[in-house]
């Protein structure tokens, strides 16, 4: 019989969330031994995961947003444990959870604790792991809302350029991406490297990504020679910028830029001139809905030990 024991690692801001308290009480009534710990500062998630594993917990619940989820997923993977993860989405965006079909209702999300876990991949870059997506936007300054005209033409990529108020403020970076049977070099405006499908609060930069295929989805938004003219033409023609993306699906990709690259890993900043992104197949056991859109393989008949 499966041990019904778990630890909920909850973002400190959610400590007074009555829905969480009620849902935890319900799980305990259902026979779950569910302990709760709160994060307070950077590094707490990893420490609490390690403490939970040392205490014999084989099931962790991540209660928070995308950043909390990334921290806990990374800590579990680094511990090389068979412990599984349930996602309790309590953030603003909840990008991985939404794309994976995890309910946003607290009680319904915790029902997934009783569903057999599935092996999912992680992405790795610069010694850091991510569950959802690495994104990069160039020339963006987060100082104001993106103008309405730009939102119309940029669509799902608009959030990468938050702060732009005129077409002339778009700047490109010269980059080179290399992977198995793939090579692209040129000026780019934005980049998404996804294990999950969406980022920035629902924007599908990698709309067909699967979290269990051992591959990363690459989405490149190239910069045309005349950025302003091209974007204006797209706007006037009512076309979306999704038609401009170059896409690939690779086990690894190397990204180089002499100008340097600012990357966002589910809220974790990373920068560098030469970065290698690698998929880590089956690195984590996650409790997801059986019909989750990000799962492509057939589930195992037996739950992991």
From Swiss-Prot:
Binds 1 Mg(2+) ion per subunit. Ca(2+) may be able to substitute. Its cofactor is Mg(2+); Ca(2+). InterPro entries: ATP-NAD_kinase_N (IPR017438), Diacylglycerol/lipid_kinase (IPR005218), Diacylglycerol_kinase_cat_dom (IPR001206), Lip_kinase_YegS (IPR022433), Lipid_Phosphate_FormReg (IPR050187), NAD/diacylglycerol_kinase_sf (IPR016064), YegS/DAGK_C (IPR045540). Disulfide bonds: none annotated. It is found in: Cytoplasm. It holds the Pfam family DAGK_cat. The keyword rRNA-binding does not apply. Mg(2+) binds at residues 210, 213, 215. The active site is at residue 268. GO terms for biological process: phospholipid biosynthetic process. One of its GO terms (molecular function) is magnesium ion binding. GO terms for cellular component: cytoplasm; plasma membrane. Keywords: ATP-binding, Cytoplasm, Kinase, Lipid biosynthesis, Lipid metabolism, Magnesium, Metal-binding, Nucleotide-binding, Phospholipid biosynthesis, Phospholipid metabolism, Transferase. It comes from the Bacteria. Residues 1-129 form the DAGKc domain. ATP binds at residues 39, 65-71, 92. HAMAP family: YegS (MF_01377). Belongs to the diacylglycerol/lipid kinase family. YegS lipid kinase subfamily. Probably phosphorylates lipids; the in vivo substrate is unknown. This is Probable lipid kinase YegS-like. It comes from Pseudomonas syringae pv. tomato (strain ATCC BAA-871 / DC3000).
